[in-house]
Amino acid sequence: MKKWCLLLLGLLPVTAWTQETTSLRGVQVTAQRRLTDTGLQKSSLDSTILHDHIASSLADILTRHSTLFIKSYGRATESTAEFRGTSPSHTQVTWNGMRINSPMLGTVDFSTIPSYFIDQATLYHGASSMHLTGGGLGGAVELKSLVPNISGHLLQYVQGIGSYSTYDQFLQFSHNGPKWSSNTRLVYSTSKNDFSYINHDKKVDVRDEQGNIVHSYHPKERNQSGYFTDIHALQDIFYNDGAGNRMGLSVWYAHHKRGLPFLSVDYKDDTDFTNEQDQNTLRSVLSWTHTESQWKSTVRGGYAYQDIAYDYHTTRQGIKNDITQSQSHTHNGYLQAEADYLPHEKWMLNAKAEAYYNKVRSHDKSPFLQHENYNKGRMEYHGSLQARWRPVSPFSVAAIIREEIYGKKWIPVMPALFADYVLYAPWKLVAKASVARNYRYPSMNDLYFKPGGNPDLEPEKGFTYDAGVEWDIRSKAFQLKGSFSAFDSYIKDWILWTPNTKGYWQPSNVKKVHNYGTEIMLEAATQIRKHARASLTANYAFTPSINQGKPSNDNDASYGKQLCYVPKHSANISARLEWKTWALQYKWIHYSERFTTTSNESDYITGQLKPYFMSDMAIEKAFRWKRLDASVKAVVNNLLDTDYVTVLSRPMAGRNFEIFIQLRPLWKQKRQAF
């Protein structure tokens, strides 16, 4: 404790940025902005992409506009992100500065985050995640709410209607004044989600009068128990006194009621079985920022609460028979202090101290357990020091030292080094390189879940090396922006849940994994004519993720094989053509084969998931009147009606349609562009 107090005292004079970037006064502004990104491999998603249409979750946006692999089996189903072939728990996520990874699972379900609620998303790849937080062995995602980009008031309503009795509604009211700003957003979505599909996991035999099989076919079935209702409410309030002080408050409530779809190999009738999950989440962050000529400091505090109830029962002859019931409650408290100091235009110093308190209570009723699962609390302390230096104009270096404490256990020091060099200034052509050591501490379920939790687990350890180039070429009517990066990562003591001899699953440190590969990101835009514009974004990732751990027994054939559900190749393209008040958009994604077994068995039908290509198309028309802006947008998902699966025995929807109507009343204030 004495050691931690000394570390905390050394970091207390410092705190973090507010929701949007605030410039420091004087010459330091230019230097600080250039130095901040020294050596970082990152990509950003702005509001144009995030606010594409109201039916999109952040999982949909990341699937179509990033190199991340989103493991999901449809809308309103659990959607986790995998950076560079790592585990979903290796992706750390913050919202307005507060980490929102589940303390139980260590992951984030991106399907529960409406993209309309996020104003800016930044992805930190590999070692660059150390700039934001620890534990991101694959990377980190930073989500922010920003001051509304309007002058005066904005009222917006969006109504969406789609296939499978799907309805989406979005309401926003924003105000931006000289000192006070407010942004209120509401989302309501509901759907039966009962799409039909050809079940390739079942076969029906047709017999003649003698009982001989004449032919067989795969039956057409409906997605059972896939219904959902999602409700979200977000309130952001910002205050700027004009004298260097800013305050922000963000409060977000969400309710989800979701049926859990039956497997395609399931023969049960959904009228007899109920399989659903109810979830309530509350998140809040309060921040205060003070800016002077060479200092910028922020103090943040936050609280998050979540309860999840899972119910699986049968109802026969009016009698309910419980099979499994589980409920969990989590409480998270958060405090942060951070500051940046610019002693000279060539130097930038940063320090940060954070404290989290996680409380988890889990209760299960199942064949294995009939009472409280576990009830645990844990303190976490995080501290970091960062220094950035530009000795000569084209060259910059940065160093980060991070330390974390979980309960009474200290994580070894996590260092990171970054460097970049400007190769050609007119094109903003920059070479970047970095190396970092990172650790991730086990989640609460890893340690305490009953049955199976393992309190003796060691933290996962990773070394990551990154190198690449980025560029931004611009002319009067054309822009080409992009990056190419190569990475090499080694993760030891990978935590893996495996079945034991007692009939349940248990985690252990069993794997050594080698992740390596390349990432390519491109953005292009051109002004064709006065009223015509074309743009394109493209992403590609090559991510071998190889198990190099010792075989657990003589029959273990997993050594040297690709990890389960990790595609080696993934790519996406988004093209948009605008002409006057019309817009046409096309999106394309591809994933290579994914193995479902650690031994990569391809001889079995269930041993691998076939590669697939997916296309979406949308057309939009904007209308502008004196007192109203409006638009109508029609979307075709799965344009080519591709038959595919992303998770074994989880069918996906075929071609389906959505239409959105957006209305924006206008006041005398300056209108916001569409």
Regions found by a protein language model. Name each.
Residues 391-396, 485-490, 509-598, 629, ...:
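Gram-negative outer-membrane beta-barrel transporters
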Residues 151, 175-275:
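Periplasmic-side early beta-strands and strand-to-turn transitions of outer-membrane beta-barrels
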Residues 59-102:
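Extracytoplasmic beta-strand/coil segments of soluble accessory domains associated
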